[in-house]
Amino acid sequence: MAISQPVIYTVSRLNNVVRLLLEQEMGLVWLTAEISNLVQHSSGHWYFTLKDQQAQIRAAMFKGQNRRVSFRPQNGQQILVQGQLSLYEARGDYQLIVEKMQPAGDGLLQMKLEALKARLMAEGLFDPRRKRALPTQPKQIGIITSPTGAAIHDMLTILARRDPALPVILYPSAVQGESAVPALLNALETAWRRNECDLLIIGRGGGSLEDLWCFNDELVVRAIANSPIPIVSAVGHETDVTLSDFAADLRAPTPSAAAELVSRDQQQQLHRLAQYQHRLQQAIQLRLQQHQIAWQQQYARLNTQNPRYQLQQKIQKQDELQFRLERVMTQTLVQANQQWMSQHQRLQQVSPKRQLPNLQKQHAYLYQRLLNAMQSKQQDSAQTLSRLSGQLHALSPLQVLARGYSVTTNAKGELIHSSQQVTTGEMLNVQLHQGTLKVRTEEVKSEN
């Protein structure tokens, strides 16, 4: 029976195997301890010892991770860290490679926060499919925050600058301390009950994790997620993230950013009004061109037909088209005036006064141009119609009769063009300019 040979390690190989076992088996661990022997190396890496009353462990935190630490650790400070157990192979030192570091108090809150976040996320409370689109043009917005904080001042300043006509209702609430949670819930319920806003902003300025904790409270988070009114969460600075941000329909990095997101820019409104005015002018011009083409087509048909009856029909048709044109132009002008008046009233609320007279002058100028164009077109049409009627009258068969000519027909009403169509003794009708003669043929002569 063969005897298995023992595995013989080198020191470096053994340390490597132990390091891999530690990293693979233990994974990431959370550790609360006192920091000591802190060395901040010129390379940017930190080396220190973590200890309690009975034991200690070496630790290292590299530059890429310690740059995200929000405080300066001190020897003797109680901290909470998350890291990977490992082994420094060159010396065989068992150590912790730290990835996250927080003061012990904030660290416990952070652990509590992560646990609640995971539970609510598992319930689907933060599912993006639950989120609603914000109204593009809110009629009235509500703000839930402290009435004395910097956040409300910043938001009101931005809203007044961007959209001074947008009504804002403040639902005052504490945003820090033990009274904050019931106050926030009461403010939300008040906004829902009164139902006077179609968009809510909830938030405050920056602070520590403990200061912002009311926005991580489960009752507040659930209330925001189930709000019947769309909510924008605007808590703290851009780096501050609360569970309210995940539950809201939209997260704004700061209260000021929230005010920017929900308001309409006054300059954009003026630009949109100018676009509407340009489109109206184009529509009126197109309608004029269409009716001008229709009139020209009718004119061409009239010009190819000579009898008076057809002329009368075309005149009536022309009158009808002219009436329809006037009615359409009147309706278009009324609609244009109504639309302008509506935009004018809104502009009075949001536009600087010095811009309003210019818009009024421009409107009056365009309005007068439109009236002048209509009157000129109507006069041209009347003159053209009068000229055509005179031409048709001059070419009428009745005018030929007035010059001494006559029209002869037989008893069947057939026109007589040649003596060969007539027999001796046949009765004929002679149409004069004034009156009709009935004659009998005495003699028929043919001209060679």
From Swiss-Prot:
**Do the record's keywords include Glycoprotein?**
no
Cellular component terms per the entry's GO annotation: cytoplasm; exodeoxyribonuclease VII complex
> Which one of the record's GO molecular function terms can you name?
nucleic acid binding
Q: What is its EC number?
A: 3.1.11.6
Where would you find this protein in the cell? Cytoplasm
Q: Name one GO biological process term.
A: DNA catabolic process
Keywords carried by this UniProt record: Cytoplasm, Exonuclease, Hydrolase, Nuclease
Q: Does the keyword Lipoprotein apply?
A: no
Q: Which reaction does it catalyse?
A: Exonucleolytic cleavage in either 5'- to 3'- or 3'- to 5'-direction to yield nucleoside 5'-phosphates
What is known about what this protein does? Bidirectionally degrades single-stranded DNA into large acid-insoluble oligonucleotides, which are then degraded further into small acid-soluble oligonucleotides.
- Subunit field text: Heterooligomer composed of large and small subunits.
PANTHER family documented for this protein: EXODEOXYRIBONUCLEASE 7 LARGE SUBUNIT
Q: Which family does it belong to?
A: Belongs to the XseA family.
Q: What is this protein called?
A: Exodeoxyribonuclease 7 large subunit
Its taxonomic placement starts with:
Bacteria, Pseudomonadati, Pseudomonadota, Gammaproteobacteria, Aeromonadales
Gene that this polypeptide is encoded by: xseA
